């Protein structure tokens, strides 16, 4: 698992925001070459991103770059510019199907070999934000071993579906849930869509908690104020950790050791799926702790 509770976007042509990247406590910082950069600014943004890959990650965040999709004819130029040391992954905008992913995998391998980077070291993150992308989410996710996460993009999805984007998000429910299920089926992390009403903290937290229950483990963020609540919501609570420790202890001592398939804990049945879920919670907490400790040393 890669810790991705917060995926914070910075326009690739915004020198001021990039200069603050090392101070930004997001798990993932994504330098953007797509929608937040006007066409005329793309060449400048590519240069700026390439020059700041190591700097942006010097505060301990993992660095991704969002690239333009193949249909724009800008993808190769983006990749030629940014595949260098310091880059951990690329996010492919408007992923339409597995052929898009395979083509990206091939290009990344060619660049890794040409530039002396470890083959397979650069991960792929898929932005699922069209009707076609939603339908092909699972085939796309398994099209390359590099794929480690899927982001649901609500803004472009609602545009493609010709519906209004709302804070309540009822119009997104099918696609949002489908993306989370596709990610889990492929063994990837599901990253929730950006919440555009960034000043409405209460609504953001409510929406994020709902997404967590759909299976999302992180969120694409557009404002620094969203980082702290995202970390809080996507990190198992102390109560959850205590519950998980208790489940593991009781099941191992009273179940596994005595040949029982189910035991009782806090008045509820605990069987193998509950036990495995508890172990997953503890593993997540351990990985988050290791990630945060590494950040402090950066």
Residue ranges and their predicted role:
Residues 1-298:
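Expand to "…catalyze enediolate/carbanion chemistry for C-C bond making/breaking, isomerization
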């Amino acid at each position: 698992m890669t810790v991705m509770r917060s995926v914070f976007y910075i326009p690739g042509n915004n020198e001021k925001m990039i200069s603050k990247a090392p101070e930004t406590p997001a798990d993932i910082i994504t330098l953007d070459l797509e929608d937040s950069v006007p066409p005329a600014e793309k060449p400048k943004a590519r240069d700026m991103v390439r020059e700041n890959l190591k700097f942006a990650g010097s505060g301990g965040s993992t660095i991704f770059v969002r690239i333009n999709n193949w249909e724009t004819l800008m993808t190769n130029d983006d990749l030629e510019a940014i595949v260098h040391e310091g880059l951990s992954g690329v996010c492919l905008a408007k992923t339409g199907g597995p052929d898009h992913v395979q083509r990206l995998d091939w290009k990344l391998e060619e660049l890794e070999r040409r530039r002396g980077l470890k083959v397979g070291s650069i991960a792929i993150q898929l932005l699922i934000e069209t009707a076609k992308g939603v339908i092909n989410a699972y085939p796309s996710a398994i099209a390359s071993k590099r794929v480690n996460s899927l982001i649901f993009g609500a803004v472009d999805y609602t545009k493609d579906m010709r519906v209004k984007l709302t804070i309540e998000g009822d119009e997104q429910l099918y696609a949002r849930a489908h993306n989370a299920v596709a990610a889990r089926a492929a063994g990837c992390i599901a990253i929730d869509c950006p919440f555009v009403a960034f000043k409405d903290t209460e609504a953001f937290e409510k929406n994020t908690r709902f997404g967590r229950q759909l299976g999302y483990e992180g969120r694409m963020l557009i404002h620094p104020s969203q980082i702290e609540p995202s970390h809080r919501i996507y990190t198992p609570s102390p109560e959850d950790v205590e519950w998980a420790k208790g489940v593991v202890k009781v099941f191992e001592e009273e179940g596994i050791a005595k040949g029982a398939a189910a035991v009782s804990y806090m008045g509820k049945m605990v069987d193998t799926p509950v036990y495995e879920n508890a172990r997953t919670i503890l593993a997540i907490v351990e990985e988050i702790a290791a990630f945060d400790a590494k950040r402090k040393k950066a």
